[in-house]
A protein has these predicted regions:
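A structural signal for multi-pass alpha-helical bundles of membrane permease subunits
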Residues: 1-249, 281, 285-511
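Membrane-interfacial, low-structure loops and terminal tails that flank and connect transmembrane helices
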Residues: 249-280
Length: 511
């Protein structure tokens, strides 16, 4: 039934719960940007430093959360934060601090979610900065050094400006990702029991739109989210495009934080620069660098260690106080029970089918489409490309309800096909492959055509081998995202025989 503007009227003027969840979402978004991005930048500088020992090991440690299922990560963090047997409260007890109800208290619940978000996203964000650092011309640092620039000035006037495009991309990605936060909150609070003081706007949209079958009202929330995300992106684009004048460079930020950043910049110098002026001796700087990275790395590893050790503990050992770090009698029955009491083998098989199908179809169609956009001229090419790029700016929760209705009308509810088709050939994948294929010399393609090669043969035997790094990158990203997908399977799957492993884990923990 057509309701005109009724859904928006109720949303904006009569629904106080919506505004409470909106404030929570703004907190998650702002916290993600202000905490994750600076931390990821410092981490990237450290991982790029020649002074860092065991660099491959630390890169593996910090990047591991990227490939960890959000369900597994959230369940582990939930146990670490438990107010009765959690490891965090145990550590605070040595400082004389009483146990904190991290998830139940309104003053700490959002910070608990932020712990999970920062742990999961910092490694991925640092990858972008680390990649950007590799493309900075090292002669810029040498020229700055000759001019007498300190480490701080090299960082402020060389590194940051050169990283501006990457920083813009990261800010937009982190803002959009945190604004549509769902899995972190949903799993931490056992599904539908999310308290109002921790609810995100997507959790609220899920409850009202899907569970209460108010699809029109849920769609109005999606439209509001799209406007907010577009507004945030435009502000960031405008702020990065504006020039920084001299007064801004002498802001209170610089006057107060110059000594701190100068200290950090001397510990984390650019990889190829030799800075003459060093407040710290090289030996002290190297020791501090390695100690700090080791501490952060160990903190990052705590959820993994707790996850693996808990798999071999009994329920009594998991809930023991003080916490039992390692079981003296490993309980291997936990693993066998997973496959005897639950159809875990079917869930894993379903995840493999879905992940491989989505990956293969995505790589095939994205590479073909990227080849067409990069090497062919046809009518409305620019318009189609811009429209495609525009769709990549629309987060999934915004189209979730219309897609749910469409899949239902196509008869694909509660099926693996319904998990596969919506995620084949995403716009960001087409854009990525277009960028890789654009670097292929046109002369090779023209020479192959002159020899009588067909278009598909040119694509398969010339283009594909040359863009194999791009294909590998797209394959890894797509497979990991598909394997860890949780929100969409949660919406359309009902029969546990069709569950993926991420959704099945919630069944094991009775979420």
């Amino acid at each position: 039934k057509f309701r005109g503007w009724g859904n928006f009227e109720y949303l904006f003027f009569k629904d106080q719960v919506f505004w409470d969840t909106f404030q929570n979402t703004l907190f998650y978004s702002a916290g993600s940007v202000l905490i994750t991005i600076p931390l990821a930048l410092l981490l990237a500088l450290a991982l790029n430093s020649q002074s860092l020992k065991l660099k491959p090991l630390w890169r593996l440690v910090f990047f591991a959360p990227i490939v960890t299922s959000v369900v597994a990560a959230a369940l582990t963090i939930k146990m670490l934060l438990n107010d009765e047997f959690g490891l965090l409260n145990y550590g605070l007890s040595f400082l004389g601090i009483e146990a904190i109800s991290w998830l139940e208290s309104s003053s700490t619940s959002k910070w608990s979610v932020m712990m999970l978000v920062v742990w999961r996203w910092t490694g991925l964000t640092s990858i972008y900065f680390l990649a950007g650092l590799q493309f900075i011309d090292k002669t810029l640092y040498e020229a700055a050094k000759i001019d007498g620039a300190t480490a701080w000035h090299q960082f402020w006037y060389v590194t940051l400006p050169q990283l501006a495009p990457v920083t813009l991309f990261v800010c937009i990605i982190v803002s959009i990702g945190s604004f549509q936060i769902f899995e972190d909150v949903y799993v931490l609070y056992s599904g539908n029991d999310v308290p109002l003081h921790a609810q995100s706007i997507v959790v609220y949209m899920m409850q009202r739109g899907m569970e209460q079958v108010r699809l029109g009202f849920g769609s109005s929330i999606g439209v509001f989210m799209f406007i907010c995300i577009l507004f945030i992106s435009l502000i960031q684009l405008r702020s990065f495009a504006s020039n920084i004048d001299e007064d801004a460079k002498k802001s209170i930020f610089e006057r107060i934080l110059v000594p701190i950043i100068d200290f950090i910049a001397n510990i984390f110098p650019p990889q190829s620069s030799n800075i003459n002026k060093k407040p710290l001796s090289p030996l002290i700087g190297k020791w501090i660098l390695n100690i700090v990275v080791s501490i952060i790395g160990l903190i990052t590893m705590i959820p993994f260690l707790f996850m693996f050790t808990s798999a071999l503990k009994s329920t009594r050992e998991i809930m023991a106080w003080p916490p039992v770090l390692w079981s003296s009698n490993p309980n291997w029955d936990n693993i066998t029970t997973l496959f005897t009491k639950f159809p875990a083998d079917i869930w894993i098989f379903n995840s493999i089918i879905v992940a491989f199908a989505v990956t293969l179809l995505t790589v095939f169609f994205c590479t073909l489409a990227g080849y067409a956009f990069a090497k062919y001229n046809f009518k409305a090419k620019k318009i189609l490309f811009l429209l495609m790029i525009a769709t990549s700016m629309i987060p999934f929760p915004i189209i979730m309800i219309p897609l749910y209705v469409l899949i239902g009308k196509m008869g694909m509810m509660d099926s693996l096909m319904g998990l596969i088709l919506p995620f084949v050939a995403p716009a960001i994948g087409i854009f990525m492959m277009r960028q890789f294929i654009s670097a292929v010399p046109d002369e090779l393609i023209q020479a192959a055509r002159a020899e009588g090669a067909g278009e598909f043969r040119i694509f398969w035997q010339i283009v594909v081998p040359l863009v194999w790094p791009g294909i590998a990158t797209l394959s890894i990203i797509t497979f990991v995202q598909s394997w860890n997908s949780f929100l969409w399977p949660l919406i359309i799957l009902r029969d546990d025989a069709n569950y993926t492993i991420t959704l099945g884990m919630t069944e094991v923990f009775a979420l």
